Amino acid sequence: MSTLVIVRFLVADMSAAKKTLADNAALLEEIGTEAKKSGARHHRFAEGIGELVAIDEWDSVEAFQNFFDDNPKIATVTKKAGAQMPPSLEFLAGVEAAGTF
C-alpha cells in the first residue's frame, strides 16, 4: 500500500515562489528523477492561501523521509522560493477502492 504525502510550505509571495519553480525547472527535473528512484510514484504542486503545497505518493513514509530529510537540492529550491522551513508534513495511507483512478 502506498503513502500519500502532503507537504505545506508557507510562502509570503506566491508569485515569486511560482516564478522560482519556473526558473529552476532543470533542478526540479533532477529532484523528480532522484525521487522516482527513491520510491516516489507521483508528485505535483498546488497553490493554497499563503502556501505552496506538494502532493506526493510514495512507496512508504520511510522512503519519503530518507529522500526529503536533509536533501540539499530541495533546500536550495525552497530557500530560493522564499518558503519557510520546516514545512508541515502530513502522511496518509492509501485506500484501495473501486472507482479509484
Language-model features, listed with the residues they occupy:
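Short S/T/G/P-rich N-terminal loop/turn motif that feeds into the first structured element of a domain
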Residues: M1-N71, K80-F101
